[in-house]
């Protein structure tokens, strides 16, 4: 007998059996339920919920401690990250250590570590207060920002976590340590998309693309957003794809309350997000609901979230153990995990390809990453350094990495590259009650192909100080790039006795100094 699947052997009254048949019948009566017991399958459903979704780690910890096996996992958003890490062979303790690390905290804010910054390609400081990038054909519609943080760190971390695991298992999610599904949202067709194969890092990234927080990505040409928009608790996916004997659900999310006349956020939320069903779609299941008091982006409260999930699971563990008869020891699951991870081919990149501007290759990106003529092999350290160097290129707006396994057991890194908009406008200045008010405006044109180039014009203007600068820069791509820049600068200082602002003209001026210079520079980095 297994819960949810009752195996029965029926003997009608008066049935006569010979000794051999009696023996066979007795064995069947003994072994039939045990056979069902050994086949009992348990599925775990993990909801979305932002930072509160890290409570799922506590759920995994409690289940493993009590020997409850997990045969399938489905997840949305934060649940897809936690679930994918478990299915990729990470233990609950390793997942917990990762989300508590400084790297994870930086990743959630869009910042880089000091060692990842490439100062050579960072713009010089100026008087800009804000900037906007635009193209001449779409000045208004495509100039508004679509993200709150830069995802370069996040995307590369997902590649390191999942890229080799996915490629080493033929990008088949059924071949992972635990079979896995995650969901993302296709906003064009207003439907939920279930990932059962493909690039695992890409599937998790799509499932976690919170609108206006992260850059959306395309999967097979379709723009993807957070799975929680249309299905924030994929219990239906678990039931339809795996049909386990028992479903455990961990939910830290909820449906938005009805909109009100004076609450813009509630109106937008109800327009964008569909209500999800947070119940188990069958009788054979148990719903765990950790306390949800953590904000969507409060990733600094990781420890509290994990503890909440652990305590909520322990509170229901007796009921779970009553229905789930199968057990697995810590030693057994550790051995299985080590065997699975031992089959993963280490990350060594021997070739670089990229998709840019409707499948056209961008030579600049390729030449900046690898020495092709020398048959260079990149380990994780070299790959990481060059990835962030390329990402720092002002002419590139977005870059997403994917791994393909080659026949020689090395990897090809494929970069989905998106060019920055042609023009960038910077506006700012210094505003004071004294007579040193200064405005600033700058305009840059950017181009990229076999080389990267930019034309820049800027001006400071005010009563005391005025300046005009024109410059042109050309960069030749290589592992250690070389750039050539020409510049022309005019400065003017007007030393006067006045507390005027921009427009008052005081005569006579006591001293006016003018300066003009130009030059040519060759730049070459010796490190980051």
Regions found by a protein language model. Give the residues of each.
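Bacterial Sec-dependent N-terminal signal peptides
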Residues: 1-41
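Short, flexible, solvent-exposed loop/turn segments with mixed acidic/basic and small polar residues
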Residues: 34, 215, 342, 441-447
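Solvent-exposed, well-ordered amphipathic alpha-helical segments
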Residues: 1, 18, 46, 53-54, ...
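Patatin-like phospholipase
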Residues: 37-76, 84-388, 392-399, 404-405, ...
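Gram-negative/organellar outer-membrane beta-barrel architecture
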Residues: 380-381, 386, 392, 398-528
